[in-house]
Amino acid sequence: MRIVADENIPLLDAFFAHFGEIHRLPGRAMDRAAVADADILLVRSVTAVTRELLEGSPVRFVGTCTIGTDHLDLDWFQQAGIQWASAPGCNARGVVDYVLGSLLTLAEIEGVDLAQRTYGVVGAGQVGARLISVLKALGWNVLVCDPPRQAAEGGDFVSLDEILQRCDVISLHTPLSKTGASPTWHLLDDARLRQLRQGAWLINASRGAVVDNAALHDVLLEREDLQAVLDVWEGEPQVNVALADLCILGTPHIAGYSLDGRQRGTAQIYQALCGFLDQPATIELDDLLPKPWLAQVSLDAACDPVWALNMLCRGVYDPRRDDADFRRSLTGDTASQRLAFDALRKQYPPRREIEGLKVRLEGESEALAQLVRALGAVLV
């Protein structure tokens, strides 16, 4: 069996070597020649897996080690009898850590009390739902917009326009789609961006084209009261440098790049491939993850929850380093910028998640215990 895989997928040998020969190559370099004799294709979001890529090849299983599937031609897969799998939720905790770290950083820069802000979460899937749980555990005011879930469940959802009008902080966590009942391509276009309330913060850690980047540039140029945090960009790996210059924080699509999340994604695709091949899944991720540098934290039950959040979050992640590295990469010509964007992702240093922390509470505090559980950490 021949496996063609994105070279940046972690633990390829540990999970897949026993299935057959692994041929590694850059995700953006995959073409028809590369998959001409492949049985299994393993990718990330940078590879568009389409009919044009696979038609005529022997590929019968495609696994993407990512949450999203907008880079897969699922309709054609069904027609061609190609099985596929994604890794839903694999890096959700890492993205939540990124958003929380960004909020803490902006609060420090602007001298804002986070508890006094109203939060709008657009998209309540794997990432959004976890973020909502943390914000509510802190007792903060949260509004949620998710039209597909609202249509299916009813419940306490609001419209996107209400989010824009009422919320001081808006965090986007939608998939990218151009069709269907709720398309998200340019969900925030020029008209909607101009509805942002005075002093609003906009965070996009979903897909770049959920926000019209050209329109956002123009709005930020006109309105100095707004702040934007962007981890994703239209046209990646090319970045709108003028837009990046206007963002208070900018990073190269690494919000979900925690070590745990990336390796969890590989493990989920391994399990799916075992199912496809009707083989037992005998390899466990817990046996492969390295020990975290910070394993346990003690908190006094009397401490302020926001202080506790800051300690736990900063213990694993601070977005300012990634922002600085990203800005240093935005020099030179267009070709060098594109290479630098991918290099930052390929060479990304190990980053763990709050979920891996063990937290000991000295004393009793249900509020702190609820926060720790919402963050995914373990009370001991």
Curated annotation (Swiss-Prot):
Major enzyme class: oxidoreductase
- Pathway annotation: Cofactor biosynthesis; pyridoxine 5'-phosphate biosynthesis; pyridoxine 5'-phosphate from D-erythrose 4-phosphate: step 2/5
For biological process, the GO terms are:
'de novo' pyridoxal 5'-phosphate biosynthetic process; pyridoxine biosynthetic process
The keyword Transferase is assigned to this record? no
Q: Which GO terms describe its cellular component?
A: cytosol
Q: Mind telling me which Gene3D superfamilies this protein's record contains? A: 3.30.1370.170, NAD(P)-binding Rossmann-like Domain
Q: Where does substrate bind?
A: 45, 66, 257
For the ligand (NAD(+)), the binding residues are 126-127, 146, 174, 205-207, 231, 256
On whether Cytoplasm is a keyword of this UniProt record, the answer is yes
Q: Which SUPFAM superfamilies match?
A: Formate/glycerate dehydrogenase catalytic domain-like (SSF52283), NAD(P)-binding Rossmann-fold domains (SSF51735)
Query: What does the record give as EC number?
Result: 1.1.1.290
HAMAP family from the entry? PdxB
Give the protein's biological function.
Catalyzes the oxidation of erythronate-4-phosphate to 3-hydroxy-2-oxo-4-phosphonooxybutanoate.
Similarity remark: Belongs to the D-isomer specific 2-hydroxyacid dehydrogenase family. PdxB subfamily.
UniProt protein name: Erythronate-4-phosphate dehydrogenase
Q: Which organism is it from?
A: Pseudomonas syringae pv. syringae (strain B728a)
